[in-house]
């Protein structure tokens, strides 16, 4: 029996099937050059029972997506004197420098602008470590939010399935943290989500007073009768109380945060790969010289024959 026949079962979001073999096969994953820097996931929270499982699962996805990558998670200082056993970004950067390793590529675990980014950039600059952009806006984030809405019964799994869901929302407030800058950036992901859902989507900041309420009111002015909240939040970057308070004060149902969604891990891996330094010109020149020498020797052998 399919899940569509089970009342209350979440509908799976349709994803593209595997590509055909031969010339249409899926491109191979790029290999990580030897000696490449590690991926340092910068978590905007202290290590704890809420943040640690999400972070560990995401890093597991990254390693499964890209064999050979070295990963580590750096948290904010927790004030427990290191009792949690988890290290901070500063400690990991210091360890890499003292060991003579390349400065790791720092990937912030946030979907958009966040208050902890300026300090992170300052800290990384002290060690010469590159910091990537935030993960969003990106279509994979819109996909993840769509999945969470579907799991909560607040959206169709895809537009091709036209049967009705009694609790489906007719408008969505895409909530995030990071103030107005984060809400503005989330608007782009909101446009991608609106195209998937075929309902209006308005972005709002959970940490900006009145932002969510204004977004809900705007949707109702547009004719929405059953608006819902959809967190553009991975998890560690937002206080759980902000999410609960927004749902309670707005009177709107809410989907779950993105959490350790598979596509978020894939996005982390691709963000890291894009930031890897290019092969050193000297190494490339040496390889070219070696290839040219091999070709010259081969040509000489053919001439002798």
Range-by-range predicted roles:
Residues 1-305:
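Active-site-proximal alpha-helix that buttresses catalytic centers in soluble enzyme cores
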């Amino acid at each position: 029996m399919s899940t569509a026949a089970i009342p209350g079962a979440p509908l799976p979001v349709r994803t593209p099937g595997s590509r055909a073999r031969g010339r249409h096969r899926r491109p191979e994953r790029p290999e990580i050059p030897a000696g490449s820097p590690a991926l340092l996931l910068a978590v905007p929270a202290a290590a704890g029972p809420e943040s640690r499982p999400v972070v560990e699962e995401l890093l597991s996805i990254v390693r499964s997506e890209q064999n050979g990558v070295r990963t580590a998670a750096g948290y904010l200082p927790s004030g427990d004197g290191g009792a949690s056993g988890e290290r901070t970004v500063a400690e990991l950067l210091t360890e890499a420098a003292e060991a003579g390793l390349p400065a790791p590529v720092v990937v912030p675990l946030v979907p958009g602008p966040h208050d902890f980014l300026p300090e992170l950039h300052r800290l990384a600059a002290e060690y010469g470590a590159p910091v990537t952009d935030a993960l969003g806006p990106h279509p994979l984030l819109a996909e993840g939010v769509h999945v969470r809405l579907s799991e909560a019964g607040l959206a169709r799994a895809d537009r091709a399935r036209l049967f009705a869901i009694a609790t489906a929302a007719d408008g969505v407030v895409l909530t995030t943290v990071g103030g107005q800058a984060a809400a503005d950036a989330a608007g782009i992901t909101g446009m991608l989500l609106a195209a998937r859902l075929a309902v209006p989507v308005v972005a709002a900041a959970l940490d900006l007073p009145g932002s969510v309420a204004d977004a809900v009111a705007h949707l109702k002015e547009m004719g929405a009768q059953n608006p819902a909240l959809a967190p553009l939040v991975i998890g560690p970057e937002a206080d759980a109380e902000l999410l609960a308070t927004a749902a309670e004060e707005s009177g709107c149902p809410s989907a779950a945060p993105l959490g350790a969604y598979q596509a978020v891990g894939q996005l982390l891996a691709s963000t890291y790969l894009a930031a890897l330094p290019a092969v050193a010109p000297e190494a490339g020149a040496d390889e070219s010289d070696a290839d040219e020498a091999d070709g010259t020797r081969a040509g000489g052998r053919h001439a002798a024959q």
